[in-house]
UniProtKB/Swiss-Prot annotation:
Compartmental location: Cytoplasm
Primary localisation category: cytoplasm
Protein name: Adenine phosphoribosyltransferase
Described purpose of this protein according to its UniProt entry: Catalyzes a salvage reaction resulting in the formation of AMP, that is energically less costly than de novo synthesis.
Annotated family: Belongs to the purine/pyrimidine phosphoribosyltransferase family.
One Pfam assignment: Pribosyltran
EC numbers on record: 2.4.2.7
Alphabetical list of InterPro entries matching this protein: Ade_phspho_trans (IPR005764), Adenine_PRTase (IPR050120), PRibTrfase_dom (IPR000836), PRTase-like (IPR029057)
Gene: apt
Known partners and oligomeric status: Homodimer.
Protein's organism: Cupriavidus taiwanensis (strain DSM 17343 / BCRC 17206 / CCUG 44338 / CIP 107171 / LMG 19424 / R1) (Ralstonia taiwanensis (strain LMG 19424))
Keywords: Cytoplasm, Glycosyltransferase, Purine salvage, Transferase
Catalytic reactions of this protein: AMP + diphosphate = 5-phospho-alpha-D-ribose 1-diphosphate + adenine
The keyword Transferase is assigned to this record: yes
């Protein structure tokens, strides 16, 4: 499946521009994995601006109330996008990291399970929320984040990420569950 092409008068193919700057680290964190490292996108100010502008232009008229970001790289992207859209930011954290009353959601990993949490007062009924992470692999983390927000009465308008790894099935899972999904680029393989 080809990437959707995002065009810019200054840069041309923005999708390609950003995709070329994502570093691939073979065999990390384990043999056979091709890790897609987004940190080069964050290190260069021009590239970071281009990345954030992609999300800001997509969501500037979406009538959102909040942006929620998933621990940890979703915090980086989500907080900047929230700031640029003049919205509040909600962190969805790994279990045991939030100091106030929380709501938790367990989800399955390839080997075992994990839990994410959100403050019980993080959003209110009717809030329209953009849910952000850096990458979609199996979709489990984003699905858990969506469930947390919906349990608090919010509507997740869309899930958004920089990278989709479609072979791992996450984007298919999320689409199948009725969650609209936007990603900047796709990479085949793990």
């Amino acid at each position: 499946m080809a990437d959707s092409i995002i065009q810019s008068p200054d840069l041309g193919d923005v999708t390609g521009y950003l995709r070329e700057r994502i570093r691939t680290v073979p065999d990390w964190p384990q043999p056979g994995v091709m890790f897609r490292d987004i940190t080069p996108l964050l290190q260069d100010p021009k590239t970071l601006r281009v990345l954030i502008d992609v999300f800001v232009h997509r969501y500037m008229d979406a009538q959102l109330d909040l942006v929620a970001g998933i621990d940890a790289r979703g915090f980086i992207l989500g907080a900047i996008v929230a700031y640029e859209l003049n919205l509040g930011f909600v962190p969805i954290r790994k279990k045991g990291k939030l100091p106030f009353q929380t709501v938790a959601e367990e989800y399955e990993l390839e080997y075992g399970s994990a839990t994410v949490e959100i403050h019980a007062d993080a959003c209110k009924t009717g809030d329209r929320v953009l849910l952000v992470d850096d990458l979609i692999a199996t979709g489990g983390t984003m699905m858990a984040g969506r469930k947390l927000l919906e349990r608090l009465g919010a509507t997740v308008v869309e899930g958004a990420a920089i990278v989709d790894l479609p072979e791992l099935g996450g984007s298919k899972l999320l689409h199948g569950a009725g969650l609209p999904l936007f990603t900047v680029c796709k990479f085949e393989g793990h």
